């Protein structure tokens, strides 16, 4: 319980790095492991009128250049990861780092449900597991700002959010009933940067998910201490017409780092210099 509390109340990434990799390296497991090279594309620097703004300012956010995985991490990718790093297998991972639903859709701890699953996005993964995976391939989870910046682009524009037709299409994706099985990653068309599946496939973890809190006047949360702890991280919501993004904020801000769901996956980012063709 003491460990879980400390993880909740410090920067989640900072706590995870010390706890998770200390345990992994102590067991002789390092971040390097063999796998097919994932595809990353460069996302150039720019500015973003984020739906999240600090109380003190409503200026656009400057976003440094970075590289992003073109698609979410697949079940096949994650299977190779847990085979190389058994700490993250569902029958080995401590409950502090993953809840009882972790990888529950797999056949066993080391086998996917069916042959087609390898190309589907991995879900039922905790924030801790997602962050550990990204670090294992030399990356990390994107910040909310990085994810929002990349997701604002369509095929030809850096920011398509003012286009009602674009917003309607995205909302249409989210309104579809859930299917029995998720489709393979990469099924959607790439955006301006070459990134796919930012909308319409799965929700995605971000590094700073636990800072995505609206201010006390605009939410009826039952944990006022959480708002006090976040302090300057408490935010106001702008652009309330962008319901698809607001739904993501509502989901992510309700989660703990050990939670996993059937609709939540992730992708990784790297420094821009590590982008791959």
Give the label of every model feature segment.
Residues 1-12:
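N-terminal secretory signal peptides that target proteins for export/translocation
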Residues 16-28:
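Bacterial N-terminal signal peptides
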Residues 34-39, 120-121, 125-127, 139, ...:
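Disulfide-stabilized, aromatic/cysteine-rich ligand-recognition loop
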Residues 40-47:
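Mature N-terminal segment immediately following signal peptide/propeptide cleavage
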Residues 50-65, 243-252:
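Short, polar loop/linker segments at the starts of domains and inter-domain junctions
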Residues 50-54, 209-217:
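Cytochrome P450 core scaffold surrounding the K-helix E-X-X-R motif
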Residues 62-166, 270-274:
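Active-site microenvironments of metalloenzymes and redox enzymes
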Residues 172-199:
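Short, well-ordered junction/capping motifs at the entry into regular secondary structure
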């Amino acid at each position: 319980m003491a460990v879980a509390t400390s993880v909740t109340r410090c920067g989640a990434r900072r706590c995870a790095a010390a706890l998770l990799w200390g345990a992994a390296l102590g067991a002789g497991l390092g971040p390097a492991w063999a796998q097919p090279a994932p595809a990353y594309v460069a996302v150039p620097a720019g500015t973003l009128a984020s739906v999240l703004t600090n109380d003190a300012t409503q200026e656009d956010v400057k976003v440094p250049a970075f590289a992003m995985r073109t698609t979410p991490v697949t079940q096949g990718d994650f299977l190779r990861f847990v085979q190389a790093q058994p700490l993250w297998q569902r029958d080995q991972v401590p409950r502090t780092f993953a809840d009882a639903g972790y990888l529950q859709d797999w056949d066993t701890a080391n086998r996917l449900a069916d042959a087609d699953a390898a190309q589907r996005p991995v879900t039922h993964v905790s924030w801790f597991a997602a962050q550990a995976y990204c670090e294992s391939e030399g990356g990390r989870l994107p910040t909310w700002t990085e994810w929002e910046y990349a997701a604002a682009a369509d095929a030809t524009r850096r920011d398509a959010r003012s286009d009602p037709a674009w917003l309607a299409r995205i909302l249409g994706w989210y309104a579809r009933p859930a299917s029995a099985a998720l489709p393979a990653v990469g099924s959607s068309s790439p955006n301006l940067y070459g990134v796919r599946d930012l909308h319409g496939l799965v929700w995605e973890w971000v590094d700073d998910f636990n800072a995505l809190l609206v201010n006390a006047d605009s939410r009826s949360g039952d944990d006022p201490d959480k708002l006090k702890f976040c302090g300057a991280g408490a935010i106001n919501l702008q652009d309330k017409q962008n319901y698809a993004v607001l739904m993501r904020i509502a989901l992510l801000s309700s989660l703990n780092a050990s939670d996993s769901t059937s609709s939540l996956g992730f992708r990784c980012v790297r420094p821009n210099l590590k982008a791959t063709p």
